[in-house]
Amino acid sequence: MSIAEDVTQLVGNTPLVRLRRVTEGALADVVAKLESFNPANSVKDRIGVAMIDTAEEAGLIKPDTVILEPTSGNTGIALAMVCAARGYHCVLTMPETMSIERRMLLRAYGAELILTPGADGMSGAIAKAEELAKSDKRYFIPQQFENPANPAIHAATTAEEVWRDTDGKVDIFVSGIGTGGTITGVARIIKERRPATQFVAVEPAASPVLSGGQKGPHPIQGIGAGFVPSVLVLDLVDEIVTVGNEEALDLARRLAKEEGLLVGISAGAAVCAALHVARRPENTGKLIVVVLPDFGERYLSTMLFADLAN
């Protein structure tokens, strides 16, 4: 029999699908990795399970431990799912600018949510989590931006899936940068096997910190944290592409209407960057894999679908 012991065993092995109708002018073949097929509908399910597994194995979590994490939403949802399945209490700090759907999902999983000022971005959520942790020794912070289990799980799973499903023929890998765990983990494995594979990082044009610019507010939830995360290894990144807010929003809407892929704003940004790269003459005939991090249903109240409310 093939029966999972709990929901955390269902994470990973997400599919690739070829993009066909939003790819006008593309000279390369663009395929999307649909991370919404994870049980809590995002790429962060991978690290949610991995960080708790690693902490349990190291004896850092006890029955009365409270899992505390600063999150822009998806990691919190993943951790809330894992905590619900394993019986831990979960407290999450999150910028108040994150969508109402994300807040409701977190609470639906039984998590306690503490909102921080939107102007402070993820730095504010991190500071609040650190403040809380000092007040009670029961708190354990997985800290996705620093935890080596983050890129490690992408090396162990995401990279292997991409390699397997493309028969090792991936030429270019495109990923938005939140923590940087996805691109770092995947690049570590695939560059060893196929050094010519290029890795493209995506960040908001309104907050181009990785490109050497200044942080700023933007609506592309999940990427562009406003600082360079310690788990991100920039030496593994071949190019950084910035994407405008409207470009990301437009592409995300088109993916739903033209490809049948209901995705979030950061997926729109990632595909926008992938198409930018795919239109270059030197990439003719190449295979581009782009990560679509989550499901669009958790953005229905945002500007992404604002025109549908009536």
From Swiss-Prot:
Biological function: Catalyzes the conversion of O-acetylserine (OAS) to cysteine through the elimination of acetate and addition of hydrogen sulfide.
Gene: cysK
CDD domains hit by this protein: CBS_like (cd01561)
UniProt entry tagged with the keyword Amino-acid biosynthesis: yes
Location of N6-(pyridoxal phosphate)lysine modifications: 44
Positions with a binding annotation for pyridoxal 5'-phosphate: 74, 178-182, 266
Subunit structure of this chain's protein: Homodimer.
Pathways involved: Amino-acid biosynthesis; L-cysteine biosynthesis; L-cysteine from L-serine: step 2/2
A Pfam entry, by short name: PALP
Gene3D superfamilies in the record: 3.40.50.1100
Descriptive protein name: O-acetylserine sulfhydrylase
Enzyme class name: transferase
Cofactor(s) required for function per UniProt: pyridoxal 5'-phosphate
A single MF term (Gene Ontology): cysteine synthase activity
GO terms classed as biological process: cysteine biosynthetic process from serine
Keyword entries, A-Z: Amino-acid biosynthesis, Cysteine biosynthesis, Pyridoxal phosphate, Transferase
Organism whose genome encodes this protein: Mycobacterium leprae (strain TN)
Family, similarity comment: Belongs to the cysteine synthase/cystathionine beta-synthase family.
Highest taxon in the source lineage: Bacteria
Reactions listed under catalytic activity: O-acetyl-L-serine + hydrogen sulfide = L-cysteine + acetate
Parts forming coiled coils: none
Database matches in InterPro entries: Cys_synth (IPR005856), Cys_Synth/Cystath_Beta-Synth (IPR050214), CysK (IPR005859), P-phosphate_BS (IPR001216), TrpB-like_PALP (IPR001926), TrpB-like_PALP_sf (IPR036052)
Enzyme Commission number(s) of this protein: 2.5.1.47
